[in-house]
Structures are given as structure tokens and as C-alpha cells.
Amino acid sequence: MTEIGKTAMETRPSVYILGAGMAGLAAAVRADKLGLRPHLFEATSHAGGRCRSFFEPGLDRTIDNGAHLLLGGNTGLFTYLSEVGAQDSLKPMDPVQFPFLDVASGLRWNLQPSAGRLPWWLLVPGRRVPGGRLSDYLAMARLARLDPNATDSPLTDFLDRSAPMFARFWQPLARAVLNTEAEDASAALIGRMLGETFLKGAEASRPYLAPAGLSQALVDPGVTHLAAIGQPPSFAARIKALIFDGTCVSGIETDSGTVAIADGAVISALPPGEAQRLIPGLEAPDQFNAIVNVHYRLEQADNAHRFLGLIGSAAHWVFTKGDVVS
């Protein structure tokens, strides 16, 4: 960064962002694009939170800290990638399809949304869930009209749990999107996801994978961008406390000292428990579901980078990349 650029950055209004997971990283990048000066604090030694890659000596391979399947309708993600110059870091899957296997029966099928907003694929048995009725799919439109701020009803309030669609589509969808069983999943949040993906057609539903790993595809470009503008994240900077002046934050106390805030905004991109610890009176979720990822190394590499949804299995998804199955 040139001295002129450094001076210009220092004159910008500041915004202080707590947590350098993907939310915090994206907030810092967007703040820069809006003409603000982002100050990003992270307690650990890396950005990205749980969205990252690491070298596993037992496999002698770099693996992702959890399997992530990204869809074309995630406009926030692709805007972020464009802002950091990493538009080509993800691999689009072609054709647009979601392969499934019912482990108990051996039945296989591909969910294949059609191009455009007219969902003619629902009329083609070979492109939809076996045993599904057209009326089952009407629930998608009903859910997409729900307001997340007006209803907290579970997904099952809108579904026929005895229909084949429940086990073969709705339950896997709830687990994949919200990491929650359909009985507890927010109907409105699932509806919003459907409205931004499947109900918009094939391009918005297109799966994307990260061939080089999550860190290289999503995290490193953001960190590099912030470093290039002279505002790299502050790592190993755990927030010990927030200092309040009434309802405004006037200081951020870290392990290395206190950062005074004369003006500017503070954004919390922290996990719920940490945010609750720092912000008096904040109500936050206190129930969570763990995700277990198991990685295997194959004797022979599979050159395809692909995935498979499993029904009636202890494992829900299988991803292959090179000679590693996750």
C-alpha cells in the first residue's frame, strides 16, 4: 500500500468487527468497499472460523474442517468472492443435479431443477424425488412466502411426515441447511433458502465445491485483500470485555490492551455464547447440534470431485476429492 493510500485509509470512519469467521471477514471486506476502515479482531490464529482447511498428518492430506456444499443462489457469498478477486475459486458442478441413495432399498435418484423460474422439472418423474406427488412440492411455494420475523413454526407443521418426500427430501434438506432435524427446523428459514435456490431454477440451485480447499477458496482471498489495504486482521486478540458508555461501546479490551472507540460502529460476528458474554442482556441460542466428519484415504484416487446424499444412513453426505472420501 502506498503512503497516499495509507493516509487515505487512516482518514476513513472506522468500524470494529469482532470475530474473523466468514461473517466477520465478509463484513470487513464490505466495510472497505463502503469507504470505511475495518478493524478485525480474532481470538485464534486463523480466519474463517470452522470454514477452513488444515493438513492432517494421519492422511498426509489437506482436508476441510467439515464438508461444505455451496449453491449458486448464495448471492452474498459470490458478492464477497467478487470483492476479493476470487470469483473462480469455486468449481461449478455440471449438470445441475443432486444425487441420492436410499441405503435400505438401494434406490438411486437425481434431483434436477430445470432452467428458469418455471419449475417444469416437477412434472418429470426422472428429475424429482421418487414417490413424490406434485402436491408435495407445493409446500415449497408456501414456505417461501413465510416471514422469518413473523413465524417460528417448525418445518413439520407444513409437511406430511408420512409421505416419501419427507424422508427423501425435507429431512435431508433441514439437516444440510440448518444442521437440525425437520421437527425442530425453522420453516421460514428453509422457505427463504428454497426461494433463493430451487424456486429460482437451475443456476440458483447449481452446487459449487472448493477443489483446493475452503481456506484457499474462501478465507485466504479475504485475508489477502485486507492485508493489501493495510488493515490485516488482528489474530490472537481475544475480546476480554466491551466497555460501555450507556448503550454505546466506548472501548474494546483485548489480551494486549484496550482499544478506545471515539466514534464508529462495532459489529459482533462472534459465536452466540461469546456475544452473550460480552453484551449485557443479549439473548442468544443455547442449544446446538454437533457435526462429525470422518475422512478416509483411498488406495486409488477418484479424479472426480463429487458428492452423494444418503438416506437411512448414519452418514448423511459423502464427498470425494482425489483420493480422500469425507
Q: Where is each model-derived feature located?
A:
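Glycine-rich active-site loop/strand segments that organize a redox cofactor
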Residues: G49-G73, M140-A144
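N-terminal Rossmann-like FAD-binding beta1-loop-alpha1 element of flavoenzymes
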Residues: P13-L40
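Conserved Rossmann-like nucleotide-cofactor binding loop
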Residues: A23, H46, G273
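Helical element adjacent to the flavin cofactor pocket in flavoenzyme catalytic cores
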Residues: M193-D255
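A short, basic/flexible loop-to-alpha-helix module at the beginning of a structural domain
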Residues: M1-T11
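Mid-domain catalytic core of redox enzymes
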Residues: L34, A237-S326
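Mobile amphipathic helical/loop "lid" adjacent to a hydrophobic cofactor/ligand pocket
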Residues: N74-F78, S82-G191, A204
